[in-house]
Amino acid sequence: KSNEITAIPRLLDRIHLEGAVVTIDAAARRTAIVQALRAAGADYVLAVKRNQPTLHREVKAAFDEAERGVFTPAAEDRCETVEHNGGRRERRTCTVLGGPGLCAWVADPKTWPDLRSLIRVQAERIGPRGPRQRSVRYYISSCPVDAEALLDLVRGHWGVENGLHRTLDVQFREDDCRLHRGYAPAVMAILRRAALNMVKTFQQQFAPDVSMGLLRDRIGRQPWILAPILA
């Protein structure tokens, strides 16, 4: 039986990662994965969630105490972005703290090798009529203290996650699936992603101006048109 914790180390052995920055959600809290990333020459950006109570508490405390003036971090950077989309305004503020003393105090260097940055991303969303929504997320990283670059990495991670899930739901109605027993949910998830990859590949090579929905329907009626990408 496999999950992210067991699958990620096997995947890392097959990928050339030197010089890359890997962003992984909370599953990567396992130290073996982080150590494998550093051994492969890759940097990491890892989400810190409440299911990691000690680390979450220490990272949050570092930002709270820095704001109160309890200490002055050796390195600090901040950036802010404001976006308007469909009548909704979203403001993101990324604050990054660093310094070897601070990082060693927050997290054991043996557990989180080469930790260099503590990251806080505060988001505020205001809709045209809805209530104001606020969220705060924390991350740790081996990357240098650079708020703009780290915010781009964090947003890139969630862009991939949200984009994939939205496409699977809209085009393949994943959220409406009522299979919950045995291996059926996992099998259907694999089939949906395989189908999505085939449609995307066909779209990129032969029909870049045709929407995903139209291509999906056409392939459903004429599956043989996929032959060039399956050969």
Regions found by a protein language model. Give the residues of each.
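An anionic, glycine-rich sequence signature occurring as long contiguous blocks
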Residues: 49-156
